Structures are given as C-alpha cells and as structure tokens.
C-alpha cells in the first residue's frame, strides 16, 4: 500500500515536470519555421549572437528555446536528422540538471547535442562523459560536424594522450572523454608545480552518458594515483602457504568467531573472520616460520600487518574466483569489472589484496603502492557547477541520485509505444537444468530465424553457455568485453536473422541493436561504393529486417538475475527499441548466487516440497516477488555501503579541498615571502613558549634547553644569555620578539648570500614538496584509521564521529608539522647547498606575476571555522 502510494507520488511528480517541459517544447517547435528560412551563414551567426546576449545579462534558460531550435535545424542540414519532441524534452531535462531516463534506441547521443551546445555558449566548457575510450571517440567523431557547423570547437580526452593534446582538448568548447580520465586529470592537476602544467579549466558542466553505471555502479571504487612502496613479495608468498592448512567454518555454526572451523565467510559483505581456533592455529604456524615471536599475539600492535596479510590471503583464496573476478594473462592478474564484465588492465585492488591473489596464482608479485592522491567519483562529479546524466535505466535509483547528487530523475516518454513481451521467470532447482532450458530456447529461436542476445553475469558463465552451443555446432559470438570497438561492431550486428550473441552484463552498452543488422555499419565496410551496390545492400537489409520482425524481433535471454533490478532492465532494454517487436525471459536456478546468498529459506523449502521432476521449472508470481525482494535487499545494502563510503570520504574530501586550494594558491603566486615570514614567526613562537612560561622573567626560563632547541632545529644561535645580562628585567614577550627579530635578520642575511630570486624559488619548492610528502603520509594514516574505526562501536562510541574527530586532529597535526618542516629546512640551507638544490629541481622552477598574501582574518583551511590567526596561524 505504501509503495503504491509513493509510486503514485513520484509518478505525479514526473508528470508535473514533463508538463512544464512540454510548454518549452512548444516554444521550440514554434521557432522551427523561422530557423528553416535562414541561410547556413545566418544560422551559423546565431552562435555569436547568443554569446553576446549572455554577456549582456541574459541566462541560458532565456535563450534555450532559440538555441534548441537552432541545433535542431543545424542537425537537419548536417545529419539529415530532426530531433523528435521527446529528444527536445530530454535536452531540457539535461539542462535543468536532471537525470533523463531515455530507453535504448531513443537517440541519447543526438539528444546530448542540445544541452551541450547551450552550455558551451558561456565559454566555460562542457565535459561529455562516457564509459570507455571507444564511445568517447565514436560520439566525438559523430557530433563534431554539427558542433563545428555551429562554430564550436570539439576536443577528445583519452588515456595515454600527450600533455599538449589534453590541454587542447580541455580548451575546446565541448570535450569528450571517460569518467576515469577526467578524474585522474583532476588529481594530476593537483600534483603539478606550475600553472602551465595543468590541463583542466574550472569544472563547469558535466553531461554523463550511462550515468547509472558511472555514478552508482562505480561509486564504490575510488580513483587512486599511487607510487611504489616497500617490497614485501616474500611475505605474501609465505602467508599464501598457510591457507591450505585452514578449514572453513560450517554454515550451521551461528557464531562467526567460535565453532569447528578456522575462519568464517560472510559472502554478503565479502569479508572473512578468523575464529578463536583459527587464530591459535595461524599464530602457531607463524611462530614455526619465525614470522612472529613466541608469546606474541596476532592482535599485538606490531603484528597488525601480519594479521592483514593473513586475512588478505584468505579473501584471495575463498572469495575471489579466477575467470569470474579476475583473469590470469601474461604472468599478471587482471581485474574483471563486476558490473560490466570488462577486463581492467592497469587497475589493481588495494590493501594488499592484489598481491595476495598474485601469490595465490603463482605469478610475479608487484610491489604494493602508496596512495599519492585519491578521490571518489561521487566527490569528483560534485565539483562541477552543473551536472546531468542520461541512461535507459535510472528510475529504480532515483532516490540515490537525489539524496547523494541532488539530481531529479525524469522518465522521458518513448517516441513510439513499447511492444516488447517480457515473459515470466522460469526457476529450476539446479544450474544444469537451467542451462538445458536456455539451450532449448536458443534452438527454438534459430528455427524461427529469430536473433538472440544471451546476457550473463560473468566471463565464466559466458564460456559455459558457449561450450554447450559448440557441442551442438551452433554458430555464435561471445563478448567478454575485452575489446570495446570490436564488441560494439558485433553488438551492432546482433539483430541479424538467427544470430546468437552471448554477452556479459553490459558489454556493448552504448550501441543499438538494429533488427536485421546495422545498415550504416554494413555500408561503412566499403570505401568506394556505387549507388547500385548501395541499393542492393539496402534491399538485402530490408529483407532481413522484415524476416526478423516476423520472427518476433530480438529475443533476450537472461541466464540469472543480477543483484540490481536496474541491470536486468538494461539487458531487457536491448530489445524493443523505437517500437520494435521483441521478447525477453530470465532463467534462474536455486544455485544462482543471488538465490543462494540472499533469497529466503522459504523459497528453497517450497521448491523442495513441490518435488519437481528433472528439467521441470516453476513459474509463479509468488516466486517472482520473492526474487524481487532479494534484489531489493541487495540494492538497499549496496546503497548503504555507497552512502557510508561517501560519509567517510566527505571527511577527507574537506581536507582534500583545503589542501588543493592552498596548493593552487601557492602555485599561482609569484612568491610566498610574506607567508614564509609569518610561518617563521608562528613556529618559533610555539617552540619558544615551551621553555618560557607566560608572564614570567628569566629566573623561570629554561634557557639552556631553549638554546639547544633553537640551534638543533632552526640552526639559530641566539645570544639569549647576553641579552639577559644586559637587560635582567626582560619579559617573556620581549624575549620572544627579540628571538624572532634575530631569526628574521639571520634569514635576510642568508637571502643576500643565496640571492632573492633563488630564495623565492627554494621557498616555493620546499613548501610544495613538504606539503605533498606530508599529505601522502596523511592519506595513508587516515586510511589505516578508516580500516579499524568500526571497532570503536564495541566501546559504545559512534565510529563516524570518532573518525571525524581523529582525522581532524591528524590533519591539524599535519599542518603544524608542515610549518615546522618548512622552517627547519629553510633555516638550515646555506648558499652552496641552495645552488645544488635549485639545479636538482630546475624542472619545477616557473616564475609568475602575482604575489600571494594570506589574510590572518581568513577562515582556516582546516575547516574548523576559526580564523587563520586563531587556528593554524599563517597557513
């Protein structure tokens, strides 16, 4: 009842917004005849007129109807394609910072040209975000003629591009690229030493294609730039040898820490826990291998790393499966994306898991990496002034889009009525029975000349179906998502009569399956083609198209339900595009991962009680409902994980923003002389008062230790005793000022020897290098804190609040250490070392035009809300 009520509310909300948008569509339609009358030159001149109007104070919303009418007319002339009204609706939604749900085949690529053109007019840049390099290149090449006709520049940002190519791409009005590349470029830009090394401009408008995949499926995977850490490959090998001696906890043992096994597995959270028995056994083995001292515990602070290695090894063996979670190729472990089924060369699991899997598979173990910079997609895309997205499946995730990104989801109606038949699920007891039924369904479709797309959840499942088809000599294509361009070509022709295509989750996503095959792809095979040949190909295509339509269109077979209903809908959505006929059916078994882990025991008991014969399936609404409930459980759990990840990352994100902001100010400044003087004053004062109490005279001062401190840490030999002898009534305030003045004179004398220009260069480089080094260490420390913070819950403390408090304290300490390290280094540097230092860092030296001065009344960058002068002084 409540669900129906909420559905009605959201449905009404969608209809109300569409009603408003349709009024704008009418305005666009009214302008169509006016733009049809314009010549090409007059049409092209509109872009500069729009820009002038924006400079004079009009908004993007003010010029939207005219801009969209212009793009529609330009598209008719350049592509011979007219934007449908539903595509105009989609364009309006995307400009209003919404998620536009547009079904497969509704023309999302053409729709994107509308908001992309409009938002590029202000000159701040538009980033169109795709899932892979192939789609970025394809869409850029496809839409460039239209944008260039309208006077806009288009850039392409791909991995492995040179600095100059990237810089040019980002300076374009519209830039195409992948989510990974945009994110990594942002991180790299915040690691440079001069403004000239940055490639990105200020982040203005992001238009994300397949937005559900990028902002939800990949939200749990942070982007990380890392550097090599110490070599510990031998330790991974030794720990790997322990795993065969450990036995898994029996499922009936309810207590994960007790029982007859050595470890327990939580498949839902993909975690492993040692039992008391397992702990004793592991400790004994480690004693025998001399990896741990007798009498110590794995839980001792100095053995935490060993415990981490043991758990990583167990996870590698018991939770990560070859050809499902990863492949082994060319002596390397290559991750398989759990959502797309695509391999991800170059990506590595963190926290030592990747090394543990390399040890398990007996391939060369690469060194662990230390994080230099990281950000989640959630926080990266929230940096944009405006963000919008398109996908065929967003409605089931509308709450998450709204709560995390503040984006409304608008379901755009289809241009033609959807007539695909979605048959009920068939549920079998065993995997073998299910596969038999799938093969029979495929054979039936072949007899009808009906094309089939078989969707699987992993490469391993694809290969099982493929082997069964090979036994029967049935020709088919298998897409394991290794080559994006090739997979798109195969998917494009998956609508040919009788063709059988097996694909993992989202292989080929972004490419339409046209009934009868893709005519455009077929024509592009020929370089020099006669009009007679074109007619011949078109006639053949029409014949095959009609044959497929009469056979029932594209038939979708799902080999099991995915964890998310959305991914099931994506698979179904490959059929029935633009009002085409089509059908879909999911085949399930009680051995499927979803059913085994998340479905209730009631279903299992009911299936057993029915006493089904071999190869007999159950088809019942009650079972379908139970499966949906299992999916909802997983969706809710995954949402909670993503939300929690964001809550924790928000803490470090505030610190990251503060550090990057300060770092950029340092880079953009001509010199930081005034800032260095303030830091000197602050650091010296904080160190002096440790030995000179407030409101005291010299008889209460620890002069000997103070002199040692100043000499050792700051290379400062201040004549404090002489000052006291000359002026016995010196107050604490006067002596502090005198020491600071002495240090300043000392520094100025050093500057004369080294040279002012050289000193300014050294100050900036030291500041940046020290900041980067400490930030790297801070990220590692916070990561360790994050991993163990959940244990605070056992002490009746809120882990999130504890994490916020401790990470803030760590950040504050890092800032204090930064100032100390900078002052200490600059105090010690001499003229001969200064020359060597500059020679070593010549590649970092850039001069600028403006001087940076930090206001003491500005808010402190640490996020405390206090002024600089009351919190972290001059920094």
UniProtKB/Swiss-Prot annotation:
May bind 1 zinc ion per subunit. It is an enzyme of class 7 (translocase). One of its GO terms (molecular function) is ATP binding. Its main location: membrane. It is a peripheral membrane protein. ATP binds at residues 87, 105-109, 512. InterPro entries: Helicase_ATP-bd, Helicase_C-like, P-loop_NTPase, SEC_C_motif, SecA, SecA_CS, SecA_DEAD, SecA_motor_DEAD. Its cofactor is Zn(2+). CDD domains: DEXDc_SecA, SF2_C_secA. Its EC number is 7.4.2.8. It comes from the Bacteria. One of its GO terms (cellular component) is cell envelope Sec protein transport complex. Pfam families: P-loop_SecA, SEC-C, SecA_DEAD, SecA_PP_bind, SecA_SW. The keyword Ion transport does not apply. Induction: Repressed under conditions of excess protein secretion capacity and derepressed when protein secretion becomes limiting. This is regulated by SecM. Keywords: ATP-binding, Cell inner membrane, Cell membrane, Cytoplasm, Membrane, Metal-binding, Nucleotide-binding, Protein transport, Translocase, Translocation, Transport, Zinc. SMART domains: SecA_DEAD, SecA_PP_bind. Zn(2+) binds at residues 860, 862, 871-872. It is found in: Cell inner membrane; Cytoplasm. It catalyses: ATP + H2O + cellular proteinSide 1 = ADP + phosphate + cellular proteinSide 2. Belongs to the SecA family. Part of the Sec protein translocase complex. Interacts with the SecYEG preprotein conducting channel. Has a central role in coupling the hydrolysis of ATP to the transfer of proteins into and across the cell membrane, serving both as a receptor for the preprotein-SecB complex and as an ATP-driven molecular motor driving the stepwise translocation of polypeptide chains across the membrane. Monomer and homodimer. Part of the essential Sec protein translocation apparatus which comprises SecA, SecYEG and auxiliary proteins SecDF-YajC and YidC. NCBIfam families: PRK12904.1, secA. This is Protein translocase subunit SecA. The gene is secA.
């Amino acid at each position: 009842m409540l669900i129906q009520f909420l559905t009605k509310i959201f449905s009404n909300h969608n209809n109300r917004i569409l009603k408003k948008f349709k009024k704008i569509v009418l305005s666009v339609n009214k302008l169509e005849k006016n733009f049809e009358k314009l010549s090409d030159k007059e049409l092209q001149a509109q872009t500069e007129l729009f820009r002038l109007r924006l400079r004079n104070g009009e908004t993007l919303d003010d010029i939207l109807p005219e801009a969209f009418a212009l793009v529609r007319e330009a598209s008719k002339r350049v592509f011979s394609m007219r934007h449908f009204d539903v595509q105009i609706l989609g364009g309006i939604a995307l400009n209003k910072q919404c998620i536009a749900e547009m079904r497969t085949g509704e023309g999302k690529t053409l729709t994107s040209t509308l908001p992309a053109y409009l938002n590029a007019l202000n000159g701040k840049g538009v980033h169109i975000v795709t899932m892979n390099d192939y789609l970025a290149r394809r869409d850029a090449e496809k839409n460039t003629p239209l944008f260039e006709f309208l006077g806009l520049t288009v850039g392409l940002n791909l991995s492995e591009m040179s600095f100059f190519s990237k810089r040019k791409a980002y300076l374009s009005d519209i830039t195409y690229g992948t989510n990974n590349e945009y994110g990594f470029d942002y991180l790299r830009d915040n690691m440079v030493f001069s403004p000239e090394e940055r490639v990105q401009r200020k982040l203005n408008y992001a238009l994300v294609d397949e937005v559900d995949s990028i902002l939800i499926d990949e939200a749990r995977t942070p982007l990380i730039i890392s550097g090599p850490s110490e070599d510990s490959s031998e330790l991974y090998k030794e720990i790997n040898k322990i795993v065969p001696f450990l036995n898994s906890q029996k499922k009936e043992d309810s207590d994960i820490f007790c029982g007859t096994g050595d470890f327990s597995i939580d498949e839902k959270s993909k975690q492993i826990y040692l039992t008391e028995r397992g702990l004793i056994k592991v400790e004994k083995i480690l004693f025998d291998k001399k990896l741990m001292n007798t009498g110590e515990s794995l839980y001792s602070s100095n053995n935490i790393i060993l415990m981490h290695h043991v758990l990583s090894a167990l996870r590698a063996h018991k939770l990560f499966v070859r050809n499902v979670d990863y492949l082994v190729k060319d002596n390397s472990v290559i991750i398989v994306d759990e959502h797309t089924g695509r391999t991800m060369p170059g990506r590595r699991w963190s926290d030592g898991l990747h090394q543990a899997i390399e040890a398990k598979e007996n391939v060369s173990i690469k060194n662990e990496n230390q994080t230099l910079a990281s950000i989640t997609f959630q926080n990266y895309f929230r940096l944009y002034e405006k963000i919008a997205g398109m996908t065929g499946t967003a409605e089931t995730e509308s709450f998450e889009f709204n709560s995390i990104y503040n984006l409304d989801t608008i379901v755009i109606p289809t241009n033609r009525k959807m007539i695909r038949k979605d048959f009920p699920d068939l549920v079998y007891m065993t995997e073998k029975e299910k596969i038999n039924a799938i093969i029979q369904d495929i054979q039936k479709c072949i007899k009808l000349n009906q094309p089939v797309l078989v969707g699987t959840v992993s490469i391993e499942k694809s290969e099982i179906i493929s082997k069964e088809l090979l036994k029967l000599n049935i020709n088919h294509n298998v897409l394991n998502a290794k080559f994006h361009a090739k997979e798109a070509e195969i998917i494009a022709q998956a609508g040919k009569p009788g063709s059988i295509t097996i694909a993992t989750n989202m292989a080929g996503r972004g490419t339409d399956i046209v009934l009868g095959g893709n005519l455009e792809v077929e024509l592009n095979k020929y370089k020099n083609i006669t009009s007679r040949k074109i007619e011949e190909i078109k006639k053949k295509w029409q014949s095959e198209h009609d044959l497929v339509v009469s056979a029932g269109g594209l038939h979708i077979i799902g080999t099991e339900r995915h964890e998310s209903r959305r991914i099931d809908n994506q698979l179904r959505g490959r059929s029935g595009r633009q009002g085409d006929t089509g059908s879909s059916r999911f085949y399930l078994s009680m051995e499927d991962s979803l059913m085994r882990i998340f479905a209730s025991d009631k279903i299992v008991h009911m299936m057993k009680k029915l006493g089904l014969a071999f190869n007999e399936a159950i088809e019942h609404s009650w079972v379908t409902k139970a499966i949906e409930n299992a999916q909802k459980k997983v969706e809710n759990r995954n949402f909670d994980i993503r939300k929690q990840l964001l809550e924790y990352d928000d803490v470090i994100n505030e610190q990251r923003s503060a550090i990057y902001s300060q770092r950029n100010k340092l880079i953009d400044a001509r010199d930081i002389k005034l800032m260095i003087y303030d830091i000197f004053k602050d650091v010296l004062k904080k160190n002096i008062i440790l030995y000179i109490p407030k409101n005291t005279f010299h008889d209460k001062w620890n002069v000997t230790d103070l002199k040692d401190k100043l000499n050792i840490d700051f290379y400062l030999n201040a004549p404090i005793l002489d000052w006291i002898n000359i002026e016995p009534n010196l107050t604490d305030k006067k002596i502090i000022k005198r020491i600071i003045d002495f240090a300043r004179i000392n520094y100025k004398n050093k500057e004369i020897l080294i040279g002012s220009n050289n000193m300014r260069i050294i100050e900036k480089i030291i500041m940046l290098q020290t900041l980067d080094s400490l930030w790297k260490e801070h990220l590692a420390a916070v990561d360790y804190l994050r991993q163990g913070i959940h244990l605070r819950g056992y002490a009746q403390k809120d882990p999130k609040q504890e994490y916020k408090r401790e990470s803030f304290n760590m950040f504050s300490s890092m800032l204090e250490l930064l100032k100390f390290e900078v002052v200490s280094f600059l105090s010690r540097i001499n003229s001969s070392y200064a020359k060597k230092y500059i020679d070593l860092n010549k590649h970092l030296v850039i001069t600028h035009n403006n001087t940076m001065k930090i206001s003491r009344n500005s808010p402190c960058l640490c996020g405390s809300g206090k002024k600089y002068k009351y919190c972290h002084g001059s920094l």
